[in-house]
Amino acid sequence: MQGNKKCADGFSDTSSIGSVLDEADREVSNLTDRAFRSLCISEDTSFHDSDLALSPEITSQVSGTFHQETVSHANRKSGIWSQLPSQGTEHSGWAATFQQQPKYVQGEEKYPKNSPLPTPVQRRLEVPISGLRSSSKPISKVSSLIRSFDRTEAQPCDSRPPPSKPPALKNTPKFAHPPESGVNFCFDSAFLTVRRVPAGVSSTHQSSHQPCRAPGEPEPPTNPEIACHSSDSLLRAPDRVAGSCEPRFPSPSLKPPKAETGRGKEWISRGTFLHSENSAFESWDAHQPKLRERKDITETTPESKAPKHYEDMPLLKEPYPAESKLSPCQGRANCAQEENRSPSGIQSTSGAWGARDSGSQVFPVEGNASQIDPQVKRNQAPWRKPKTGKGGTDGPHDASEDKKQPNRKGLPLYSKLNPQGQLPENGVLDLPEESSDHYSSPFNISKLLTPIISTKHVLETSDTQPVETSPSPPGQLNGYQEKESSEAQSRDSYKSKAPSLLFNLKDVRKRVKSTYSPLPLLKGFDEKTRGKLDGKQEPLSNGVTLPNGLEENPPTAELVKETLDDAPSVLHSSTQKDPAMDSRESFADSHPTFSSPSASSKTHFSINGEAAERNSHEKEEANGESEQGLSEGGWHPDSRENLPRKHLSLKLCNRDSETGQATEKMKPRQLEKRLSRSISQETEPEREMGFQNLPVSQKFSPGPLSPEEEDVFYSDSQSDFTPCVQTKAKFSTSSSDQSFASFEDQQKMWFTEGPREDGKSHVSLGDNQKDEKETEVEKEEPQQCALHNGVEEHRQKETQRKAQGVLGGRPRKASAEEVSVRGSWTGADKDTALSHAKDPTPLPASTNKHRLFPIKDNTLRATPVIKPIILPLLRTVSSEDSLSGGHKENELPRQPWGEDAGGLGASESQEMRNTPLSNSTPSTEQKCVVYEGVEEDPVHTAAQDETSQQTRKGSFSFLPLVEEGGKTKPPPDTADERLAHEKSRSADSGKLEAPQHIPTIALHSDDLEDSPPSLPQHTCWEEQGFKSHFLSAPRAGPSGRRPVPSEAATSPNPSSLGGSSTCSPAASSIWEDASQAAGEHWQRQEPPGPGPWASPGPSGPTGLTRREDMTRGLTWEAEGSDPHLERLADFRTLSPRGIFLTGAAEKPEPSSLLEKAAGKPPAVPPKTEKALRRAKKLASKRRKSDQMSEKHTEAWEGKSFTEDAQGTEQRPVSPGKGPRPRFPEVRSLPPPTHRHSVSCGWEPAGRRPWGSQSLIPLPPYPATQKVLQDPQSGQYFVFDMPLQVKIKTFYDPETGKYVKVSVPSSEEDPSEPPLQDALTAPYLLYPGFQPVPVTSLMPLRCSSQLAAPTFLRQGSSHRPQSSQGARLQPPPERLGESAQHVSSAQRPRGPPLSPEEEGAEAPSLSIISTDDLEDFATEGVS
């Protein structure tokens, strides 16, 4: 066994329990189990369950008996010696029992060892364990081997498992072998703690682990005690090895990942496959004498220190478990907290957990183990290092812990927890140092993996590492690089990354399949939220003093923090930094108190690193006070007291403005805490666990780990992935936390993975978080921050677990936390806060995170596709953005997501486009500033941020173009364009990066218009981006094609970016102001964006933006053309209108490019290749159908693209009418509300562009004019019906039928003049593209809402028509055509008008006002 141990260190390949089982069996068992453990937290959980079960007994024997000898023996044997003496000891025991563990240890040894504790807690853990184990036991050999190889492939699994923690819930089945793998994992990370800790501690942790698992959350089970320990023990009390698995698995994403990160890092650096079980560890043994040193120290320490560590550790562990448990399961968390506090005497909330705490505390060795852990960690392998970081130094660790207790907690509860309390401090400090040691591996892993994991860590790294390591902030985008600089961060990053990688590898399919967009988005958002929470939870606190107060108020604040940790997921990142604070925040998230923002703030701090560390410290204390924290309301005062302490990071409350400050602060914090990343990592798992454990809603995110991994990406995007942009552009901190604020459904899937831009869609969390949300709704404003963090994390989890189901009808309040973070976040929270530009402050983190997801989805596989689809995408962006517009965001979040597309796409869309506000918070805030103020500089900044994110995403070919035009171009137009472009990019990346960019691209393509429409285009882009975000979410969800699932999943970053500003009322109002102020520009601009691509395209997108005004339909139509090819692939099938939309989008004959793009798959690539192909197929089919329909009228519509362009200008009316129905199709998920929502948000925007355009054709809409859509071009034309009765066939987008309308013969003539007019307008001056359509689209929206005020005075029948008349009227022909189209479109709008009715309407139409049309559309669409 010793020989085996040597080989089977933690992830040994060989049979580490050769003595117990067959050598082959053992080998396979160890290989599978350890590989799995390394592979994912789910594994870790399984491992903890079985191995911990084994570990308790073996820990008792090995840890207690062998602890000294076995420490060296196990360490020597398994190569885990590098991990920790106790760890080695436990490992030896574990290795021996683990191999038999699947059979015996899994349920037996664990129970025997921890017989008393496991009963209540273990059972819970066991349930998940059983699930994991069930899969693992039977599949232990082969499956484990496969997992082992996966681990080999993603050695970061060590660190990844913690991030996988949420995935553990979701992927636990995936990692069916976690039991065995759990052993592996434990060996790397949990073993760090478990091996090192005496049997008693192990039993306690096992008990914690088991109970946590029992609930069916493999990871959360580990999390309550083990996860908490993992995050707390590995970081603070690494030697809390009692829950070796627990710490490792419970907070696998944070703490174990850190440990594993270190280990993986070292392993990777060695090039050995630690994941290859024995060989990896052997390799390490051979290659890393330093690890041996650690092992020796560990060995020495185990005898004397293991007990002490466990004494402290149980408390730390317990407190942390409380958080962790709270996260996965509040009950669990409570138990953990109670356990933690039982000794403290403050744990009176949870009697059951109090018992558990007793079990945990029964093993006083925790304190020693904790002390040992630091040394061992330092001296042992990187996976152990997390422990060292946790324990810092044996003696100093205790002292530090003691100090920390008074310092951080300052509560009597921690007299017992004092060692533990001090432990985190040294551990935090040490861990960062160690993090650097094993950071390389995580970093490598990060590079290895898709940037998904990187994002979150980058976020934390950027925020946290900058302090720890000045050089690594930008470069640390990968969580791994950061780890080098800041070990804590690196570990956290690695941890997040590893699970993310794992999820990418293993769950990407599941994610894509499950909730193609929503699941990945939510997943990404969860992760992102986690990362965000890490960096942002704390800072967000400044919005709510809770997080800071948590830190300062030892008992209450800590409790709150712990509870918070338990609740949302703030715990995940905050847990590391400020456990108590995080817990509180998490709890606050879960329990709407003022803690919600705390959670965000904490998360922010976590990301800042110091925040994470602070959270970790506080978490320890909070663990001690978890019970108290459970009564969330009670701790708020303390939270406020603690506020000052966290005030450092608290600053981040102003997400946008303070993002930079927070980022900077994060850096100091990082330096200050040094364990920030480590703690963050540790906390991350806890947070994940908290998410899983705390609220059922949050539990929805089965894979906060996966989302966490994605969150890593998201975080990176939010915090560090777009760290430069984030940190520099104020995205850093805000985005960091809020990146998942965008986590709405899809929305919250950042970019689908949304993470940043996808993040928005992470409403999937919404369902579960609904409870949380409802609770937090009361603190919706704080929730904006906290929810952004916690809910985002939740969303991440939900995204992983059920991005699509949850996202389904989350009431805005039900989603208040999740949906509020995703949908309500961007819908309600965004409505409330972003609208007020307050949420935008928090949302930036979300935004960035969401963007991060797009970064993760940076593999926008459709980037090439995006190029071809650029025009259609532009249109789609316009359409989608319009649809995703503020109205959609505001309204739809509540209604459409749940309703349409099973509420998934809608929720995704809604939240995506809501989160866009979050995601675009900087963008939104900047946009708001831009729209309210100059729309230029802020836009530019936002554009820069978004461009950076988008650039990172590199989603679209024209992202650079747009970036060039928007980012590179200095003119206001450029700024606007850039902003719009950024938004488009974000939106596009997440949902339709191309669509959003298309308008901007169009702008770029039409440089002549670039300048004049600069502001308008920016607005337009924003609107379009909004739309795109919104649509993107649905698109991301329904259609795999969207990278937005990444982007949208994270935030619907597209939504967040584009939709954020348009989406939020604040943005909306700003847009309205800007619309009116820059109406002309916007009008001009909008066409340049969409117009250049295709009159219908721009018109469609813009119109979609004003979908409420009729442009919605058109926008969708335009959108349907290309983006909707992707999206329509998703939505068109959903609704016949989708076809029309596609047709409309393709119809814009003026833009061959547009049509070309329309012919191609949506610009924003689906999340997966398969999804992309599917999207392409659907798009092609729909396009063909649409084209057939178009061709019906193409001859009619052949009037001229000039007319079309003019018609496009007028199209807004029609889009509202026609595409509006189609919009639901395209956005099958939330068509009606979204339309209205989009209309709401977009109308103001539309108004503005149309304000200028309206100047041109304002009066031309006589009663004789009708707005009709050309089926061929999909453009809307205003026709002067009375002029000449010429029967023309128009396609009614609403009804999907062709209507013969009498169009005046002079129709073409008027069309010509309007065309000239349109051409006169910058937006109309697009050679290849018909800017008019864009204008049309924008005006449509505008006409509906903006036009009403702007054009209501128009003599025309109503403001809408007036508005359209004003915009579309310039070309009489277009007017006539538009009038005709209005007839057609109008029919769909309201009761479909029969052709005669339409014809009659045309002459006596008096131009149905866009309002009327909007009403019709609303009726029809809604």
Swiss-Prot record:
Keywords: Cytoplasm, Phosphoprotein. Residues 201-210, 342-351, 461-470, 907-926, 944-954, 1048-1067, 1353-1366 have a biased composition (Polar residues). Residues 590-606, 731-744 have a biased composition (Low complexity). The modification Phosphoserine is found at S327, S472, S815. Residues 1087-1099 have a biased composition (Pro residues). InterPro entries: CEFIP, DUF4585. The modification Phosphothreonine is found at T119. Residues 1-23, 151-177, 199-265, 279-443, 459-500, 516-718, 731-850, 877-1127, 1142-1244, 1353-1422 are annotated as: Disordered. It is found in: Cytoplasm, Myofibril, Sarcomere, Z line. Residues 284-298, 305-315, 395-405, 481-495, 524-537, 579-588, 611-622, 635-644, 653-675, 790-801, 828-839, 975-991, 1185-1202 have a biased composition (Basic and acidic residues). Coiled coil: none annotated. It comes from the Eukaryota. The keyword Mitochondrion does not apply. One of its GO terms (biological process) is positive regulation of calcineurin-NFAT signaling cascade. The keyword Kinase does not apply. One of its GO terms (cellular component) is Z disc. PANTHER family: CARDIAC-ENRICHED FHL2-INTERACTING PROTEIN, CARDIAC-ENRICHED FHL2-INTERACTING PROTEIN-RELATED. Plays an important role in cardiomyocyte hypertrophy via activation of the calcineurin/NFAT signaling pathway. Interacts with FHL2. This is Cardiac-enriched FHL2-interacting protein.
